[in-house]
Amino acid sequence: MSLQYFRELFHYLRFSYNKRGLYLTLKLFYLKFDNIFFDLRYGIDSSQNVSLDKLNFQITNKTEGVEYGTIAPYFIQKILELVKFDTSDIFVDLGCGKGRVLLIASKFNFKKVIGIEFSPELYLIAQNNIGNCLSNNHFITEKINIIQKDVLEYVFNHHETVFYLYNPFSNKILIMICDQIKGSLIINPRRIIIIYVNPRFPEILIDKGFKQIMKYDLINKKCFVFSNQVQN
């Protein structure tokens, strides 16, 4: 962690105190600490944001993406605990970045955990992070498969059931992804769950026929969960 990172953290917490008060700022500090401690505990690199202009690669839809952002492990864990999954479910992180969510998802009863990442640099970091956890029995890393590919070039195998998005795309890309998912439902009708964190365009999923089945708020983060079927 750089000195600049901790300076920015200090200013962020001071701003939060002025805006939210002591109690919520202490909760926010815990989440920030959880963010950093996760990396230190498992010897990985996943806690710092990376803007697209810092990544050295060319891709048609690069301008339609957003920066790699981090989310506290507690938040991810809580969301996955609240949503009902089956042991046959296949989890896909569309824009998996450094692979943090993949590691946490591997602890749950998913049949497979797949990450799609278009940046070669982030893909390599994610692979290294997974590799550093191979001997750690806290995660089931053999379930994880990371694919370095533009998400619009990824061919859905018509069996994926749980899609995770941490606000990774513009509205244009999100529309095309929803169309691809709906197209796969024609070939293999099944229950789909979409976990949308920091949702900028939830109306797109609603317009595409997905129903919001859950909402989870945690101070400065929101998560909407959608499905093509209403769970009982």
Regions found by a protein language model. Give the residues of each.
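S-adenosyl-L-methionine
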Residues: 1-86, 123-158
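Conserved SAM/SAH-binding beta-strand->alpha-helix loop
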Residues: 119
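C-terminal substrate-binding/active-site "lid" region of AdoMet-derived donor-dependent transferases
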Residues: 172-230
